[in-house]
Amino acid sequence: MNETEYFVVDTPGFEDEGGAWATFCEIAQLLDHIREHAVIVAIFFVTPINIFKRRPDPFEEKLYTWLREMSGERFMKYVTFVTTFWEAHNPDQLERYNDFLVRRKEQEWARFIKHGAQTYQFGKVYSAGVETTLHWDTDAEQLAAQAREMIRVYCHEIPIIQPLILHELNMNMGLGSTAAGQVLWPAGDGGTNDQGPSRAQSTASSGGSGRPRSTESPQSGAQASTTPTSPPTTQSTGDDPAAPGGWAWFREFAWEITKRYGPQIVEHVINRQFGSAGAIIGGNGGDFASSMQCMSAKGFDINSVTDTAKFFGKASDMGSRGPNGPIGNGPIIFSIKLQGSYFAQFLNRWQNEDIQAFDPKVDAVNDFMEQKDLFMETTVWNTHCQSWYKSRQTGKITALWPGSTLHYMETLAKPRYDDFDITYASKNRFAYLGNGFSQDELNPQADITYYIRDKDDGLSVFGNLFSTYNAKDIGDKMTALADRAI
């Protein structure tokens, strides 16, 4: 559609709770294989209407919970509940099917629909305002056409976000640790739930208790690369392998611990501690990883500044790739330093005041661009010269500052925070006030009465609020404060 290739994948169906985990493993393994090569544009949850009951049984309710955790709230708008087998033998049967559908929409599917999910009655048609149904045996061509139309209607948009399960797999989470995996994880299973899709599939299909077999290959992905496959062969002279207290015994014991818990340590400690697998979520709910997947699927180069700008619908010319600055009429090094200092003020406030996000207001951006364009009309740059900071198509001057270098410096000296929408990480914007102590007070080398002077020297009493000092060992420093009678 629209020169984009679409694939419809018919995944295994859920028959009963006993085989649910194995089915989920097959679906997850499929997603794991395609996640670097394609974008999920829709999820169709297909259920025959003729198996519905007045009230859903516990397994059906669990499947809805699984679907919710698998898609995630932000992807629910791309979920469609498709009901099939609408062929009814009499009006009463069709009315009963419609009652089942209404109940599902008002109760079990209500949360999905609230977040944008759709419903589709496959096989139901209207003729002259009368509701009728198609039959598999006699209306195959019409049903095929209806299926194609369903795909066209519900898959025309390529989302910038992806199902939650893909985010979790991108973070190298074990399948049983994912939100969806925790819903279907077999009750009473003592095995580890930190297996990847491929390994979990092998375990589930073995028919055992869910514990990994000793002959299984290492997990794929980042965890496999950090999981050794054979113990060290170096052995000290004189070690007795049979001696319980010998070094050889200790090395074997340590190696077993490494093989068993190494992947979990890497996933839950190292990756989480240093943030190497953390998702970057934008204000509209989209995340960076999904955007990059969408770019690749559309043929854009994720390493190209130009392609990135084009993908997000922005101007891709050279002058549109950075902030306006006086680099056409002033020293470039000075401009770069000013921009760095300006940015550092945002970082300082961001970390000190527990701020989650700064988002430039659209009106402020538009007002600045209007003022800049009016100024540029009066300058020499508005003549018929060509330069990298001037669009060849429109003639608009895109990258220069509407003023001199000192004018630029004075403007950036104090950020205009009122031109930004600020989102705080805490419900209370003043929660960052904390325990009432300044970080400078926790520095034993700091002059905490710097404001006492012999004469008025004209300097601000606020002092310099920038510091690389960090009071992480606050316990010791609080003790030092008590010793200094502060």
UniProtKB/Swiss-Prot annotation:
Keywords: FAD, Flavoprotein, Monooxygenase, Oxidoreductase. Residues 186-243 are annotated as: Disordered. Probable FAD-binding monooxygenase; part of the gene cluster that mediates the biosynthesis of luteodienoside A, a glycosylated polyketide consisting of an unusual 1-O-beta-D-glucopyranosyl-myo-inositol (glucinol) ester of 3-hydroxy-2,2,4-trimethylocta-4,6-dienoic acid. The HR-PKS ltbA produces the trimethylated polyketide chain from acetyl-CoA, malonyl-CoA and S-adenosylmethionine (SAM), and the ltbA cAT domain then uses glucinol produced by the glycosyltransferase ltbB as an offloading substrate to release luteodienoside A. It is an enzyme of class 1 (oxidoreductase). This is Probable FAD-binding monooxygenase ltbD. Its cofactor is FAD. It comes from Aspergillus luteorubrus. Residues 194-206 have a biased composition (Polar residues). InterPro entries: FAD-bind_Monooxygenase_sf (IPR051209), FAD/NAD-bd_sf (IPR036188), P-loop_NTPase (IPR027417). Coiled coil: none annotated. GO terms for molecular function: monooxygenase activity. Belongs to the FAD-binding monooxygenase family.
